């Protein structure tokens, strides 16, 4: 138990209807600018749920097992992720691919190159292409943006780009 409050002050942005890439990029830029306004050292981590879902599809992960695997990814618990993957019928090579997501984290360009090389299907390639397009926008903006493909949102809710920000001195994402 964390002994922290159950309520969390947070801010979000939701886009309804057809969402174009430019709108997504603007949302990421807004997050960057918001963190920069706080004046402390900051990091913005970016991921794409399409990459995770594409890997699940490629490995034949049953729908019922996916929320549990996402939970283990969020916890960054390689041992339990492997165990849950094997319990879901994923072979050793597939479990290696899932735990490998935990290593797809770091500088945006280097991590994206590794992610592109690991794509197994069109869904993963499409997510990587969207992250590549976003990289061009981020280069122009500067800032401390990292790619972390183990960053996973709630399965029922998030389906595309996800991101969260950190400030120096705070133990949790904003």
Regions found by a protein language model. Give the residues of each.
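Acidic, His- and aromatic-enriched active-site or binding-groove loops in soluble protein domains
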Residues: 61-86, 90, 167-170
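Short, solvent-exposed helix-helix connector turns and helix-capping sites enriched
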Residues: 48, 76-77, 107
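Hydrophobic mid-domain F-helix/FG-region of cytochrome P450s
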Residues: 32-36, 50-60
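Short glycine/threonine-rich loop-to-helix capping motif typified by GTGT followed
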Residues: 55-63, 156-163
């Amino acid at each position: 138990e964390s002994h922290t409050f159950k309520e969390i002050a947070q801010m979000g942005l939701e886009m309804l209807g057809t969402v174009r890439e430019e709108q997504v990029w603007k949302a990421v830029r807004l997050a960057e600018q918001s963190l920069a306004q706080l004046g402390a050292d900051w990091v913005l981590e970016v991921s794409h749920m399409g990459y995770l879902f594409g890997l699940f599809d490629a490995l034949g992960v049953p729908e019922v097992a996916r929320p549990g695997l996402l939970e283990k990814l969020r916890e960054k618990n390689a041992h339990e992720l492997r165990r849950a993957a094997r319990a879901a019928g994923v072979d050793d090579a597939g479990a290696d691919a899932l735990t490998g997501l935990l290593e797809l984290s770091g500088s945006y360009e280097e991590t994206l190159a590794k992610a592109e090389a690991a794509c197994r299907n069109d869904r993963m390639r499409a997510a990587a292409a969207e992250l590549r397009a976003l990289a061009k926008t981020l280069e122009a903006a500067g800032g401390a943006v990292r790619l972390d493909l183990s960053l996973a949102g709630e399965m029922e809710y998030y389906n595309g780009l996800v991101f969260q920000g950190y400030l120096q001195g705070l133990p949790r994402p904003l």
